[in-house]
Structures are given as structure tokens and as C-alpha cells.
Amino acid sequence: MRCPYCGYEDSKVIDTRPADEGRTIKRRRECLKCQKRFTTFEKVERQPILVIKKDNRREEFDRSKILNGIIKACQKRPVSIEQMNKIVDEIENEIYNSMRDEISSREIGEMVMEKLKKLDEISYVRFASVYRQFKDINTFIEELQKLLTEKIE
């Protein structure tokens, strides 16, 4: 591994430990020339998954799009960025563990709504209103009634 300080091409590993719940290896290294220490992370490279959009276009899966949507839905709500990242991690893992090459944006949206419903109902309704493109207040009320019915059962 090239030293980020002096550019020397060789270093030794001083410490290795799992990170990110075992999905990453964190290594502490020391340059054999300048003796400065630095940290590297090793992660399995996943095969790209394509997302099929509503208009049938395909684009590479981008977790930041999910996170941005969740952040907007959770604005001014008691939901931490750690909780939001956990949702995105869970969804990303479910997608990759499905062993599929493609997934529809609709399926991803449903996964997000399912997770938000369990975490914060207001954030869920906000996300659903944009995702399902509520046309008027009646559509909004219908979704709230469904949520209340599920809560009672």
C-alpha cells in the first residue's frame, strides 16, 4: 500500500480488525520509509445492481438517493442520522442478498416505506405522500386511515 505521506510503495500492517459489522476490514499500517502511520479499509467489491425506473430506464443502484429521500421525510422529526443510515444499510443488504441483477424503484420505495412505518409514522406518511404522488387531501386521508386501521389491529 502506497504511503499517503511520502509515496513509498511498501508498508507493514500493525493492526487488523473488523469494522462496519464485519463488512469491512480496518488496517493500521506503518510506512517502511518514513515510519508514519495511516489507516486503510478493505471492503468486498459488490457487483452493480441496476434499478428499473418507472419509465423503464435502468440506472446503477445509488444508496445516497435512498438516504436523501429518508432525510427529507424525517426532517424535524426525532430520527437520528444513525437510524436513517441503518435503514439504508438494511435495504442495501436486502437488495444485494436477493442475488438479483435488477430491482424496480417501486420495490425499493416499498422497502423504505415499510422501514419508516416501523420507525416514525409521520416520516412514513411524508415519504408515502411523495412516493405515491398523492393527488389531493382525500388520498392523504385514505393513507392515514389505513395506518390507523393497522395500528388498531
Swiss-Prot record:
One of its GO terms (molecular function) is ATP binding. Its cofactor is Zn(2+). Keywords: ATP-binding, DNA-binding, Metal-binding, Nucleotide-binding, Repressor, Transcription, Transcription regulation, Zinc, Zinc-finger. A zinc finger (unnamed) spans 3-34. GO terms for biological process: negative regulation of DNA-templated transcription. PROSITE patterns: ATP_CONE. Residues 49-139 form the ATP-cone domain. Binds 1 zinc ion. InterPro entries: ATP-cone_dom (IPR005144), NrdR-like_N (IPR055173), RNR_NrdR-like (IPR003796). Pfam families: ATP-cone (PF03477), Zn_ribbon_NrdR (PF22811). The keyword Cell membrane does not apply. HAMAP family: NrdR (MF_00440). Belongs to the NrdR family. Negatively regulates transcription of bacterial ribonucleotide reductase nrd genes and operons by binding to NrdR-boxes. PANTHER family: TRANSCRIPTIONAL REPRESSOR NRDR (PTHR30455:SF2). This is Transcriptional repressor NrdR. It comes from Caldicellulosiruptor saccharolyticus (strain ATCC 43494 / DSM 8903 / Tp8T 6331).
